[in-house]
Amino acid sequence: MNLAEGVQYISFLILAFLVIGAALGVVLLSNIVYSAFLLGGVFLSISGIYILLNADFVAAAQVLVYVGAVSVLILFAIMLVNKREDFSKIPGRWLRNVSTALVCTGIFALLSTMVLITPWQINETGPFVENTLVTIGKHFFSDYLLPFELASVLLLMAMVGAIILARRDLIPELSEENKTATALTLPERPRELTSASK
């Protein structure tokens, strides 16, 4: 995205404050539905930062995968489960709070050290790519063809496994003598449920 330097700097600051504010809302709000919506806001703000970095494909993938899939999945899970439980006191809670604070402080110190010691100068000699989608597509189908195909096979296996798990409740109970005869057949919906749905 070709913007003036001042506009790009201000846009980055606005998006960074949106990311930090929405992330704090995710972890501090008691209503989990509001937290899920703010998580979608975090993902949208991160995609805006990707657009400022001229990574249009990564920004589109961020919106499609995280906002369109993960946030909607979390909202559906919250609304379908809808189970309210009262908070109960956990023994040794102060020890957990202290250990959590120490871990968070260590991670913050590590990230701050990395930010301070990393050289952030931009190399101007590199070629500027106008359309990153074409370049990523060429790399997918030339240099990274095998990992791309393996990822598609893994996604297909996950989809088949999800379908089998979803249909497991509809498989009828089989007796011991019929198990050996129908071991290699695909599970089908019981006739009672099929006729009832019609």
From Swiss-Prot:
Transmembrane segments annotated in the record for this chain: 9-29, 32-52, 61-81, 100-120, 145-165
Compartments where located: Membrane
EC code: 7.1.1.-
Pfam families in UniProt: Oxidored_q3
Family named by the database record: Belongs to the complex I subunit 6 family.
Annotated GO MF terms: NADH dehydrogenase (ubiquinone) activity; quinone binding
Topology of the protein relative to the lipid bilayer: Multi-pass membrane protein
The organism's place on the tree of life at top rank: Bacteria
EC class of the enzyme, as a word: translocase
Designated gene of the protein: ndhG
Keyword annotations: Membrane, NAD, NADP, Plastoquinone, Quinone, Translocase, Transmembrane, Transmembrane helix
Name used for this protein in its record: NAD(P)H-quinone oxidoreductase chain 6
Stated role: NDH-1 shuttles electrons from NAD(P)H, via FMN and iron-sulfur (Fe-S) centers, to quinones in the respiratory chain. The immediate electron acceptor for the enzyme in this species is believed to be plastoquinone. Couples the redox reaction to proton translocation (for every two electrons transferred, four hydrogen ions are translocated across the cytoplasmic membrane), and thus conserves the redox energy in a proton gradient.
Catalytic activity as recorded in UniProt: a plastoquinone + NADH + (n+1) H(+)(in) = a plastoquinol + NAD(+) + n H(+)(out); a plastoquinone + NADPH + (n+1) H(+)(in) = a plastoquinol + NADP(+) + n H(+)(out)
Cellular component aspect of the GO annotation: membrane
